[in-house]
Design a protein with these regions (language model features):
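Short, Lys/Arg-enriched charge-dense amphipathic segments
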Residues: 10-19, 69, 142-149
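Conserved aromatic-histidine-acidic binding/catalytic patches
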Residues: 5, 52, 132
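Proteins with a high burden of low-complexity, intrinsically disordered sequence enriched in S/T/G/P/A and R
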Residues: 1-6, 35-40, 45, 78, ...
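Histidine-centered nuclease catalytic patch
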Residues: 1-36
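A broadly tuned preference for mixed-charge, low-complexity surface segments
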Residues: 29-47, 118-132
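C-terminal, charged low-complexity interaction regions
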Residues: 77-156
C-alpha cells in the first residue's frame, strides 16, 4: 500500500469489475481451469503513480483507444503511452472476456449508426459521456464514445 492513510478514505476508493463473472468462473472450474483474471483481481496491490492510469484522471480519456472488435489500445499521446500499456497489462484490460463484452456492446451500437446523421451520432456520444440521474455510466461507455467519435471524425 503506497498510501496507507488513504486505504479506507472514500475519495480514494474505486469500484472494480469482479475480475470474472460467476458464469465464467463456473464454466472454467467445470473444465478444470482457472478463469482469466482481470481488473482488481489481477492488479492486486500493484500501484505505480507514474504508470497507473486512473479512471478519475483527465488523461484517462486520451490514454486509451478502442477497436470495434472490443480491443483496448494505448492512446496516441506519447506522454501517456507507457502508462497506458502498463495499465492495460496490469489490469488485464484485454482479457478475452472483456473484449467479447465490449465487442457485443459495440456491435449493437454499430448496427444502427447508418440510420443516424453525424449530428445525431455526436449527440449520442455526448449523452453517453455523462452519468445518468443515478450517477452511473452505460457499461463500456468510453469504448462506445470513442468508436462513435471515430465514425464521425475518422481522421482524428
Amino acid at each position: 500500500h503506497s498510501y496507507p492513510k488513504l486505504s479506507l478514505d472514500y475519495s480514494n476508493l474505486l469500484a472494480s469489475c469482479p475480475g470474472y463473472s460467476e458464469e465464467e468462473a463456473l464454466e472454467h472450474f467445470q473444465h478444470g481451469k482457472l478463469p482469466q483474471e482481470h481488473c482488481g483481481h489481477l492488479k492486486g496491490s500493484w500501484y505505480d503513480e507514474k504508470l497507473m492510469v486512473s479512471p478519475l484522471e483527465e488523461r484517462c480519456e486520451i490514454s486509451f483507444r478502442y477497436t470495434a472488435f472490443g480491443e483496448i489500445l494505448a492512446g496516441s499521446s506519447l506522454e501517456c503511452k507507457e502508462a497506458s500499456l502498463e495499465t492495460i497489462k496490469r489490469l488485464g484490460l484485454n482479457a478475452s472476456s472483456l473484449q467479447r463484452a465490449r465487442r457485443t456492446v459495440l456491435e449493437e451500437i454499430i448496427s444502427f449508426v447508418d440510420e443516424l446523421s453525424d449530428e445525431e451520432l455526436l449527440n449520442l456520444a455526448q449523452d453517453l459521456d455523462k452519468p445518468d440521474d443515478e450517477g452511473k455510466y452505460v457499461r463500456f461507455y468510453s469504448a462506445i464514445v470513442y468508436v462513435l467519435k471515430a465514425l464521425i471524425f475518422p481522421h482524428k
